[in-house]
Each structure stands twice: as structure tokens, then as C-alpha cells.
Amino acid sequence: HPRVRRQRQMCIRDRYPDRKTPMPQDPIFQRYYEKFVAALAEEFNDPEYTSFIDGYGLGKWGEGHSVAYNKDDVSAVDENTETVKREVLDWITKLYAKHFTKVPLVINYHRVLGHPTSQGTANPNSESLVALAISNGYCIRSDAFGMNNSSWGYSTWEKAIAAQWRYKVPIIMEGGYIVSSHSYWNDPAGYRQGHPEDVRQGEFDSSAEARVNMMDFRVGQETESWFNDAFSLVQRFVSEGGYRLYPDQVIVPDQVSAGSRVKVASRWRNMGWGYFPNNLPQWNYKYKVAFALIDASDKAQKVFVDKDCEPSTWVESKPFSYTFETPAVDLPAGKYTWGIAIVDTTKENRPAIQLAVNNEKTAEGWVKLHEVQIN
């Protein structure tokens, strides 16, 4: 009977009689959840509208805290918990990865990920669960930045995970405290009561240490606090955080014989503390450096993609140099302008990434270099 099936999927928490939680290992729940994720992807598996998907959703706040596997006691841990926990995480991350093929996927990292508790010492299997999610195509995020409690905050274990995966997958930050309602002044960091800017500074400092690619300012009063109490930190992240890519040296000829191949060179730096995650499976190295020959109307008449120039490797402001030989330049004789860009190879090699340069750009997004005469 359908009603009996629904009851099998749910259990009721004693303290919150109106709250229900599924048993995520229940095959009936999984069957219907798979339909839900498939329908969700039909709407949101589109990078034009979706930046990323939090692809776990189990436990408190969907962050993998206090995940229940026992319908009679939601906090129960037995000899099967670790096995079931891993099987569920593997199932749900593969499920999202199957349907979200174009949009990055994200999971929270913390010391009791997927466990029937929300605090305590690090579970010995949590590190391997994070690695499993990443192997299934995930990025990582923490929603406890600025919380320094060793039992439930962003502490030594979480910092070690961030360091382990630095420049391999992007990390997303969200602050743990809601400064308008949480007693943040009890934090071990010594935040002063009535000084939310202390919390913002703590979150920012941990974000810089973790080399986060994105700072999530949450919503409502939290966002207002970032702008009203710590706007200088917002400005710093805009200029320092994530990736900041630019070519600091480009060598192109000013004379080209029609039909000839041309050698060009470029040197790139990433001045941000994060990295450009071109290696994400959903992106699959689709962003590449390209050169263009632009006509008098600012239209790219020829585009040459340097497939060996890989932006995901550019980190820590180090210079990365490349030399590239173009295919034959088969354009009519005349004056053109060299352009350079990072293009999306899945969208007809159109410029896709804003470069951190002040040079003039075409409407299409090509950074203009200098004129070239084709003879």
C-alpha cells in the first residue's frame, strides 16, 4: 500500500514530533529521490543560470550533520553505520554527478560528515568520505568559517582538509555565525560582543588561509553585515580572492605572410589566492587561451586556440610561459589587430573569462594587443 511505503521511508524524532527524516539507505526513498534529482537537473543543469549545486542535502541544514540511519533511534550508531554511511554518500554523489554534467557539484567537509552526530572528535573515516565525494566529481565547502570551537567549528581537521585539496578542487566559504542572533563573543577567538566586524575578520582570515574560491555572504542581515561592518574585506576579496588571471607578457608579430604559420608566445599569472578550476569534470578543461585576428569592425576573423596552455595550473602569482604555432593564416591581405582571451571551447571559442587587465576589449571580449599587417 502506498501509505505503508511512505511510512517505511520516514521516522519521527521524539523532540520534534512534526519533523520527519528519510532513511537515506531505504531503496524506496532512493527510488523517488532519484526521480527528484533527475527532474531538478532538467531545470538547473545549465551553467548559464546555475553556478553550482549543493549535491548532498542529508542531515541538519543539508550539511551532513546528524544523518539518521536508524528509524527507531536517529542518533544510533552500530556495527553497520560506517558501511551504510559510505554507501549512502557514494550513491547520492554519483546520482547528482550522473544528472549534473555541466554544473559544478559541492559537498560540505567537516569531521563528522554523514555521521549521526553534529559534533565531537573527527571520525576516522571522514577524510576518506571527502575523498570519495571528490572522486565522484565534487568540490568542497564549509559553512563553519569563523567558528573556532574544536568540537563543532572550523578547526584543525577542517583546515588540514582544505590544505590537502588546495588547488585540486575549489573551496567555498560560508560563515558559521549569524551575528544578529548567535553568541559569537563566546568563541575561542575572543570576538568582542557588539563587534560583528571581529567575526567577519575571522572568517576572512580563515578564508585566505584555505585559499577559497568563493565567499558566500549568506542572505539578509549577514550580507548587510559584510557590507556595513566589513566592506574593506569585501573589497579585498574582490581584488585578492578566487582567481585573477592575466597575461603579463605576449609576443606576436606585426607582419604576417598570408598562408603562413605564426609563432606566438604568452606568459600568464594568477594573482588571486585561489585557482581557476578548469579541471572540474563538469568543465572538462573547456577553457583555453586563444589568439584572434580582429578586423577593423572589431570582429574576430580568425581564432587560434592554444590547447597546451592550461589555466588550472596557474597558482600563487608564478609565471607560466607558453609558445604556440598557429595553423596557416588564410586571411585577405590588410591590417588586423591581435587579440587574446580565455575562451569556452564548447561555445564556438568565444571569450568567456574576464581577464584582470585594463587593455581595451572588443564587444566580444577579446583583449586588444597591437596591429598586424597581413601581406
Residue ranges and their predicted role:
Residues D54-G62, V67-Q221:
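Catalytic-core regions of glycoside hydrolase
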Residues Q7, Y49, R211, P332-Y336:
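Short loop/turn motifs at secondary-structure junctions
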